[in-house]
């Protein structure tokens, strides 16, 4: 090896050594922040930050050189708060310093003096935010963190630590118990805290010349005026309920209250049953998002009134169990009891399903703490590595950003977007399914009274880029805690929901139609709840540049046919184009579309889950990125006969929507329809469970007559609306009657795929078997009275829990009817085109065996009243009026609404419909 080669290698090694040295500061900071966030997530019941050094304490050892080892921690409060002689709340705390190998606990005096020379030398690397909080809960100690290694999770969980207990000097001038502090360990460019007064300034290092030696360090300077104001500075209260062993999630929602509106913050402590109500005028009102608004336990309470800039309350909530109580007796459930249990079974469907931008940025390099504006020198920690990322990220955000506002902005990221920029940042292997969870990140910039902290040049363009959050992948992203890197305080919570789409950590801002990013100087709020805000649209050319890796080769050509792109899919299981397979590989053998969850529909909708599948179509739950709403998408089979049938359905649905714009007729509304990959797709409003599932959650025991009456009145209202327009639904059944809400009795009719106008009958084989009228079975002419027959069968099933006529085929179905109602009139048999199948030549029914017992059915041997045992004569008469052999003798929808059994609820339940 020549000397030239050796020189090149030596030079290369020197460059690497210098690079490692320059990167050590940021690397240590990132490790400290990650471990701090992980420990906060895993074990800290109550993490209370250390108070900023508002008053320096006396220390005569200014010239002693000490090796200060500090950690990036949020120190838990060990002992209860004690009231000082001046009325300030002072916590007991101890600062442990290491001089060589010897540890010396130092307890500073509680007396404050304006002429105090310095805070202890061991505060050299301590930087603290100017916020204060108080807490009384005892938590485990945190382990120290050395920059060269990361302790295993077990040490964090057990709370064992090799380092001493950290206590801070008490001071009577301190107005609050503690404040958040963040320090780095063994960093070459320590962050110093300088306090200036009329008598001079003192540095918190072992030598007053440390600031000169460490030219790259960030210095936070305080004047006497700022220190006096800091005594009255607003407190940042963080109240955490203890986590249970099952790692319950936290819930924080941002209220829509006006600025500076008084907010009552309730803190519940499940350990000691104490509650404290803190009434503060808040700049950003953050309220608790609970399942129910319940008052705090009345055992003990304390009220504190404090002027605050921002009050953040984080409360642990336990999501309701999705299991319902099992009834062992066939007793009818009361209405209130049913919907109370349903409230635990199913939560509102539209909850957000996506991680916030800050959560996505947790996987990239976090920007270092920013310098004060008074310091003209840029910090060495604010290096070009973070600026390169921030500049790229900001350029992408520009296309979706609104006009910057000087106060606050809301950034909404919709469910599991592959969205448009963070997919370049976050690895797909980090994608986790977080069904029924939504993450809300609230980032609040706290201003110092003397001078406000400015973001670094790379991250000043966007508040999102300036504050990154760190999430614990080891916990499979079930809990996400956000850690502030600059002079911002970030709070991240996870809210449980039940019907949310599965979350993916690969996010993008631009693919969310409601995402708005603005530069904010005071408050930036990032939430995942879908809202109806203005959407962001990108062109196919931009989508190809940003997401070409997320698109298949066929999609890269297909996307050019769609002028507006909202979503490109968030899955690596996309269907591949194959010209040798049916519909180029997008369909199965019978013409059904191959549904892939998390994929897109027409570059606008995200497929969340499959709701149902029938002989004509598939129904999926999707998220509309244009409107920010959850919708139901009906994907028709790729066959001509189904296509023609769907065109008739569209014609009827649009006619109904035109005649019922306010949806008073309890009929589902069609939102839109379009073609995608040779499939006709219809979009509808998303409703709750159908009545069959409603019976299923009650273990098919049926419901009381009051609830049955409510359903009956609403169905009659819909049938009257259809009857006036000569429309036959032709497929009434419990599966096609959906609850509007899982906790209320409002319903809507769906599925008009078999419907027709009365004078334009298309099909002869209609209606589901259990609810099929005799004229359809016998092949005679039918009219809108077939829906009345179906109504009678449905109401009996809701009451009893089982079908009234459960035939396995048409002969058995007709035999079941004749067993209860007797033989049909001769006129009905004579008009039948299929009488040879069911009757002998003399008109007697052919024998039919019970498919379950094997016994022959007999005619008229089963009493109707004995079959249902309702005990309500009006109900029995109403059902019998619906189940007449002759269609002309059946009750009409108009007459049904005036029936004695229905009239009791017609006023509140059946609103007037358009004429």
From Swiss-Prot:
Keywords: ATP-binding, Kinase, Nucleotide-binding, Serine/threonine-protein kinase, Transferase. ATP binds at residues 611-619, 634. GO terms for cellular component: cytoplasm; cytoskeleton. The active site is at residue 731. Disulfide bonds: none annotated. InterPro entries: DYRK, Kinase-like_dom_sf, Prot_kinase_dom, Ser/Thr_kinase_AS, Ser_Thr_dual-spec_kinase. Residues 51-79, 108-119, 170-185, 196-218, 261-287, 300-333, 352-364, 379-391, 399-425, 433-533 have a biased composition (Low complexity). Residues 605-902 form the Protein kinase domain. The keyword Protein biosynthesis does not apply. Signal peptide: none annotated. Its EC number is 2.7.12.1. Residues 51-119, 132-334, 349-533 are annotated as: Disordered. It comes from the Eukaryota. It is an enzyme of class 2 (transferase). It holds the Pfam family Pkinase. It catalyses: L-seryl-[protein] + ATP = O-phospho-L-seryl-[protein] + ADP + H(+); L-threonyl-[protein] + ATP = O-phospho-L-threonyl-[protein] + ADP + H(+); L-tyrosyl-[protein] + ATP = O-phospho-L-tyrosyl-[protein] + ADP + H(+). PROSITE patterns: PROTEIN_KINASE_DOM, PROTEIN_KINASE_ST. Residues 234-260 have a biased composition (Polar residues). The keyword Transmembrane does not apply. One of its GO terms (molecular function) is protein serine kinase activity. PANTHER family: DUAL SPECIFICITY PROTEIN KINASE, DUAL SPECIFICITY TYROSINE-PHOSPHORYLATION-REGULATED KINASE 4. Belongs to the protein kinase superfamily. CMGC Ser/Thr protein kinase family. MNB/DYRK subfamily. This is Probable serine/threonine-protein kinase dyrk2. The lineage of its organism: Eukaryota, Amoebozoa, Evosea, Eumycetozoa, Dictyostelia. The gene is dyrk2.
